[in-house]
């Protein structure tokens, strides 16, 4: 909902030569964005116009969540290098606290917003915002459960298996502002004497 969130959009069509520069998304991440939803091309070592080496150029300390429909960015079994999902989450001290990325192809339908990867992405957002499921792992599972009735359609079955979560599945999106508990005042005998 736009009345509750600041939404930043990066569309190729809005840039000279229909190509926004990678520094745009890097600046968004460095400025503390909470969520990124990516619909675009990827590979094992490339997503959101960034190559895995670019993850080391990030300086953010407020980590984000990324959901990408791109191909292969979550291919953790790639033989030649760690996939970019791993670089966003565990290979650097910056980037994302969690990502959902495809181990293989992202599946779309030309001229439609009902592609197979988009169905899982939409159901993920429905789980978080519509069904009130704040845990990132439960929301990912729910997106898969909600697509079971059409498991035989096109490439739904493939996306079911390949849309993988990198990160702690028990992490929750904020439902309210977190405040740390009060530090307990521990009183007792000094120096271990009773």
Kindly give the residue locations of the regions a language model identified.
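Structural beta-strand segments of beta-rich domains
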Residues: 192-194
């Amino acid at each position: 909902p736009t009345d509750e969130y600041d939404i930043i959009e990066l569309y190729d069509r809005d840039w000279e030569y229909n190509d926004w520069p990678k520094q745009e998304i890097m600046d968004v991440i460095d400025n503390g964005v909470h969520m990124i939803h990516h619909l675009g091309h990827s590979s094992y070592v490339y997503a959101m116009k960034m190559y895995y080496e670019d993850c080391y150029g990030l300086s953010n300390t407020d980590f984000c969540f990324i959901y990408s429909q791109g191909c292969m960015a979550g291919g953790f079994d790639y033989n030649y290098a760690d996939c970019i999902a791993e670089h966003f989450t565990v290979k650097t001290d910056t980037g994302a606290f969690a990502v959902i990325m495809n181990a293989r192809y992202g599946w779309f339908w030309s001229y439609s917003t009902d592609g197979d990867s988009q169905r899982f992405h939409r159901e993920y957002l429905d789980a978080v915002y519509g069904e009130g499921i704040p845990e990132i792992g439960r929301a990912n599972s729910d997106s898969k459960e909600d697509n079971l009735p059409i498991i035989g359609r096109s490439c739904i079955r493939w996306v079911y298996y390949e849309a993988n979560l990198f990160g702690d599945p028990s992490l929750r999106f904020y439902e309210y502002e977190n405040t740390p508990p009060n530090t307990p005042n521990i009183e007792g005998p000094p120096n271990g004497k009773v």
